[in-house]
């Protein structure tokens, strides 16, 4: 979105609600690993190894995101529960890839309305196959442009969706808040909004 014109008309039927969630952008993650100069060719093998040692696992990334974005995730749930235009109640949640920040948002909403954990994990795990091909390779090309190798930890971070990652996120939510509903409440979602979310999601079909 920062590199290309907005494709949607501002006066059209789609209302865009921007909710920045820091820490989830793969490009931002990659840039954060680079030295201040950002000059990829200067990276020595030891420097590359040191950078790769800083790469978080998806589980670590998800816990970090959750720890600082309860208000944003609550706003996503609120927007779904009470859409800005009642005549057009459908919602599309998306980030750059639709994997990490989106995966957490969808997992939170599904968990908060009572979806079985196994179904949430299975839904998240499907993302990897959906991203395979051009998108995944473009992400690895971006890493290569920064002088970083095609390392397993980078490929997982940018292109994969192992069940263990979302399992770790759900475990953290349970340990820190009890459940997803309580996590969303900690971000400002009210009980009435939570009830509306459950009604809208369960009656959507």
Which residue stretches match the model-derived regions?
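Ser/Thr-glycine-rich phosphate-binding loops at phosphate-binding pockets of nucleotides
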Residues: 97, 101-102
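Cys-dependent protein tyrosine phosphatase-like superfamily
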Residues: 1-92, 104-205
């Amino acid at each position: 979105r920062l590199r290309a014109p907005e494709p949607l008309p501002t006066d059209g039927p789609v209302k865009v609600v921007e909710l920045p969630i820091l820490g989830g952008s793969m490009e931002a993650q990659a840039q954060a690993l680079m030295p201040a100069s950002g000059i990829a060719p200067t990276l020595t093998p030891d420097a590359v190894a040191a950078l790769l040692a800083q790469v978080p696992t998806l589980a670590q990334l998800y816990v970090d995101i959750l720890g600082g974005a309860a208000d944003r995730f609550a706003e996503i749930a609120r927007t779904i529960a009470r859409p800005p235009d009642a005549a057009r109640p459908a919602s599309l949640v998306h980030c750059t890839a639709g994997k990490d920040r989106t995966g957490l948002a969808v997992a939170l909403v599904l968990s908060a309305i009572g979806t079985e954990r196994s179904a949430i994990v299975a839904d998240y795990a499907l993302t990897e196959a959906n991203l395979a091909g051009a998108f995944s390779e473009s992400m690895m090309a971006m890493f290569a442009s920064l002088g970083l190798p095609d390392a397993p930890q980078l490929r997982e971070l940018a292109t994969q969706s192992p069940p263990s990652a979302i399992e770790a996120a759900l475990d953290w939510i349970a340990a820190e808040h009890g459940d997803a509903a309580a996590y969303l409440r900690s971000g400002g979602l009210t009980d009435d909004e939570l009830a509306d979310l459950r009604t809208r999601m369960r009656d959507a079909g």
